Amino acid sequence: MTKSKLRILAVGSQNSGVTYHRLALPLSIMEKEYCLITDTITEELLKEKNFNVVVINRFLESVPLLQLLEWRQKFGFKLVVDIDDYWSLFDKHLSAGTYRKLGITRIIKDFIRYADLVTTTHNRLYLEIIQINKNCEILPNALPFDKDQFTAIKKDNDRVTIAHTGSITHYPDIQQLKRPIEELAKSRVFRENTRMLLCGWNEFNKWHWNQMGNLYTANEKLEYKIIESLPVDLYMNFYLEADMLLVPLLDNKFNRLKSNLKALEAGAKNIPILTYKRAPYDDIPTIFEVDNWERDIKRMAFSKQMRDDFGYRNGEYVREHYDIFKINEARFAIYSKLIE
C-alpha cells in the first residue's frame, strides 16, 4: 500500500462552523502524511513543515492574496480554496454592508481565480465558480454519523420541542415565522404542549437576538428555551432536546446557493426538518415540505408518528448519501492528483 504524500496546511478561523465542517473535521480523519489546522499562516511555518497543499475557506483575512501567491511560488505548494457560500450577499443580509465596505466579494473572487483548485459543496455553486476558475471539484458537506457528537442520542421531553438553530445571519429568514407563530400562540393546546428552542444566542448581536427571541416565542407567550452559541465540537448539543427543526430560508440567490447541512444535522438526530422544497433542500427527498408554516408546524407538533416517520427517513437518507468517510475518499483522490 502506497503511503500518502499529502502534507496539508488548513487555515481558518477558530471556532468557525465553516472551518470545522469544510476543513478541520474532514481533514482530521482523512488519510495523509501530515496535517496542521490553524488560524495563522507564516513564511516560517511554510518553510519548516514543507507543505504541498494549503487549503483555505473563501479567503484569508490576515494575509493578502499577493503575499500568498509569492509564498506559493517560493515553496511550491498547491493552493486549494474551498467555497461553501455564494460571495455576493443579498441586501438584507446582516453582513452586506461590511462586504461592500471592505470589498469582500471582489477579494473572494480573486482567491477563486488564482487557486490551483477550488472545491465546493454542490453543483449550483460549481456552475458559478467555473465562470471564474475551471479547476473546480464538488465535495459535499458530510458528517461522521453515529460518532462523537453526531450520534442519535436525544433527551426525552415533556413537551414537543421545536428548534431553530443557526447564527444571527438568519435574522431576515426567521421573519417569515412571525405571523405563523403569533397565530400558533393563540391555541391553548399548542401553548400547553410545545416548547420553542432557539439555539445560537450570542451577546455580540444582542439587539438582533432579542428581536429573534421575541418573534420565535410570540413575545414569550409560548414556553421557550434559549441556548447560547457553543464551541464547534459541541454544537450538536443544540439538537439533544429538539423534536423537529424549522429552516425558513428566504428565496434568493444567496440562500439557493447554500448547502443542505441542516438536513444532515437533523438526520444525525433522526428528527424531521421542515423547510421549503427548493434549493438548497430540494435534493433531500426526506424533508417535510412546508406550504403553510402555521398549519405544518401544528401538524408535525401534534403527531408523534409523523415526527418519527420523517425523522427516521431523513436519518437513513443522509447516512447513505452524506457519509464523511465516503466523501473523504474523493477528497483524498482529488488532493493526491493535485500534487502529482
Predicted segment positions?
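Membrane-proximal helix-turn-helix segments that form the acceptor-binding/catalytic region
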Residues: E70, T98-V118
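Active-site proximal beta-strand in glycosyltransferases
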Residues: R72-F90
